[in-house]
Curated annotation (Swiss-Prot):
Function of the protein: Displays ATPase and GTPase activities.
Keyword Protein biosynthesis appears in the UniProt entry: no
GO MF assignments: ATP binding; GTP binding
Record Pfam families: PapZ_C (PF22740), RapZ-like_N (PF03668)
HAMAP family from the UniProt entry: RapZ_like (MF_00636)
Binding site for ATP: 12-19
NCBIfam families associated with the record: PRK05416.1 (NF003828)
Protein name (record): Nucleotide-binding protein LAF_0356
């Protein structure tokens, strides 16, 4: 019996990192097609299957293709309905501010920008992609990710060895810098005592043992964390049963330096000890206090 074809559709906001994604999938051994027209994707997949030489392929579909916005959602539905392949949809995004900055740096025009500039084009594209984003198997916010970090995220989720495993992404962040766009669960730990106001701890972070001890030795933090971990421990099997391929848990404090980093590190360590594949990302830990 022929091996089932694995298909990944790479899509999302223009400027959010699809070029890096293409390189990442190529390095993983996927057969990659950039700028696939949705209306011909099904026929192309049929041709790939008939060749019998390819078992993993990735296709980039985005606003460069004529008719993309009208055709992509029906295309995804058609491919998902097939029993002879598995389909996963990767959606890349970033904040408006970050996308504007990237376009200014590259000096390229946004595909939906007219004479009114880059930002209105980004806003139009985001609205047009809402339905597609809701169907994604994995949404990755690349706002604070370097190309290397994005490649690592893709490798951890789409390498052949990890293709069918559930994956937990634990991240810390600072509320003052905005909510993470790709979080499934957001946990607010701003009620915990803040090491920022302790002179010896102010310029350390939740990656340092002294800060971790200050936060976790507090009875309130201990009680809270026990309840938090119990909640996550109960919820994860349910997410897996529902077919969710990943879960992003975002832990937030004021600046993303101390409390959120400490709790995120502790949660990630305990989940790893419980045999869950876990990636930890401290979004704002390197920002100045």
């Amino acid at each position: 019996m022929a091996e089932q074809l694995e298909v990944v559709i790479i899509t999302g906001m223009s400027g959010a990192g699809k070029t890096v994604a293409v390189q990442s999938f190529e390095d993983l051994g996927y057969f990659v097609i950039d700028n696939m027209i949705p209306s011909v994707a099904t026929k192309f997949v049929d041709a790939v299957k008939q060749s019998g030489e390819i078992t993993r392929m990735a296709m980039v579909m985005d606003s460069r293709s004529r008719g993309f916005y009208d055709q992509v959602v029906p295309c995804v539905a058609q491919l998902r309905g097939r029993s002879d392949l598995t389909l996963r949809l990767l959606f890349l995004e970033a904040t408006d501010e970050e996308l504007v900055s990237r376009y200014k740096e590259s000096r390229r025009a946004h595909p939906l920008s007219h004479q009114d500039g880059v930002l209105p084009g980004i806003m139009r594209e985001r609205q047009l992609l809402n339905d597609l984003k809701s169907q994604a198997d994995l949404v990755v916010d690349t706002t604070t990710l370097t190309p290397r970090q994005l490649k690592q995220r893709i490798t951890e989720r789409f390498s052949p060895d990890e293709a069918h495993s559930f994956y937990v992404n634990v991240m810390s962040f600072g509320f003052k810098y905005g909510l993470p766009l790709d979080a499934d669960l957001v946990i607010d730990v701003r009620f915990l005592p803040n090491p920022y106001y302790i002179p010896d701890l102010k310029y350390q972070t939740g990656n340092d043992p002294a800060v971790q001890a200050y936060v976790m030795d507090n009875p309130l933090a201990q009680n809270f964390y026990q309840h938090l971990y119990s909640l996550i421990e109960v919820a994860l099997p349910g997410y897996i049963k529902e077919g969710k391929s990943s879960l992003t848990i975002a832990i937030g404090c004021t600046g993303g330096q101390h409390r959120s980093v400490t709790i995120a590190n502790r949660l990630a360590a305990d989940l790893k000890n419980n045999q869950y594949p876990v990636h930890v990302h401290h979004r704002d830990v390197d920002k100045a206090n």
